[in-house]
A protein has these predicted regions:
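Short, active-site-adjacent cap segments at secondary-structure transitions
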Residues: 75-79, 125-127, 233
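Conserved CoA-thioester-binding segment of acyl-CoA-metabolizing enzymes
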Residues: 1-71, 108
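Well-ordered beta-strand positions
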Residues: 138, 178, 182-184, 190, ...
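C-terminal long alpha-helix characteristic of the crotonase
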Residues: 38, 140-145, 197-244, 257, ...
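Glycine- (often His-adjacent) and acidic-residue-rich active-site loop
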Residues: 12, 64, 72-108, 153-156
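CoA-thioester-processing core
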Residues: 106, 110, 120, 126-179, ...
Length: 277
């Protein structure tokens, strides 16, 4: 195994206590992004979302970067959604609309970064984490990977239209509707079978080594050709979006009694009682 791979593997497995919640690690032409809240299964804070945008902007300015790899620290999760405790402060329509607008900005920035992006997924990849992975160009998984948006049984909120469109184009309407309504998580083999990931490897160490290898391969390809292909695919996806906003869907869910119940139930580790109101 190459030294650069071992270096990355050791950092991802056991980051130092004083490391930031999002680690930006440059190794040659490859920019690594490590979501670093392993005790919280790498659930995203507002700071982590902001740092992800900043790293993407830095990559856009640095022509020596040729590929990005995103993964989660600790080996237990890629990203288990947004940190739910942050939702307790939601009280107004603006809170709900701003949250989804912020999420759209993060995913758009990642989706449009000029270099190819690889999500290296081990463990749960749910909610906001599933959105991040869907915004990447390529995905690899270990055998422990699980993917989905289980909000119909956990929080009672909804996705933005942009995220619904990403899921629709990646999985097709039938499977997208299936995982959204049943709130189930796909395992690694189903992710491979439906094309969500291109490879499944045995464990986290193999996953990180393969991600580095794939990123190095992409780094040898024509940057403008890859950028044009990425942008063309994004524009095709954008044509699926209907006219008009999705604020009615967002407000109906986020301002509901059910959403407040979902947040409190999740944090209390109990089953929510849905009323449809």
């Amino acid at each position: 195994m190459k030294d650069v791979e071992r270096d990355v593997i050791e950092l991802v497995r056991a980051p130092a206590e004083d490391e930031d919640e999002l680690i930006a690690l440059r190794r040659g032409p490859i920019q690594w992004v490590v979501f670093n809240r392993p005790r919280a299964r790498n659930a995203m804070t507002w700071h982590m979302y902001e740092r992800l945008v900043e790293v993407c902007e830095e990559v856009n300015e640095d022509r020596s970067v040729r590929a990005m790899v995103l993964t989660g620290a600790g080996g237990r999760a890629f990203v288990a959604g947004t940190d739910i405790s942050q939702f307790r402060s939601f009280s107004t329509e603006k809170d709900a609309l701003d949250y989804e607008a912020r999420g759209n900005h993060v995913m758009y920035t990642l989706e449009t970064v000029r270099v190819p992006t690889i999500a290296a997924i081990a463990g749960p990849c749910t909610g906001g984490g599933a959105g991040i992975a869907a915004s990447c160009d390529l995905r690899l998984a270990s055998s422990s990977a699980r993917y989905g948006f289980p909000i119909a049984r956990t929080l009672g909120n909804c996705l933005s239209m942009q995220n619904y469109a990403r899921l629709f184009t990646l999985l097709g309407p039938a499977r997208a509707r299936d995982i959204l309504l049943t709130a189930r998580l796909m395992d690694a083999q189903e992710m491979l079978a439906c094309g969500l990931v291109r490879e499944v490897v045995a464990d986290e160490e193999s996953l990180l080594a393969r991600a580095q290898e794939l990123a190095e391969e992409l780094a040898t390809h024509a940057p403008l050709t890859m950028w044009a292909s990425k942008e063309a695919m994004r524009r095709i996806k954008e044509r699926l979006l209907p006219e008009g906003a999705d604020s009615d869907l967002i407000l109906a869910c986020y301002m509901s009694r059910d959403f407040k119940e979902g947040v409190e139930a999740f944090l209390a580790k109990r089953k929510p009682e849905w009323r449809g109101e």
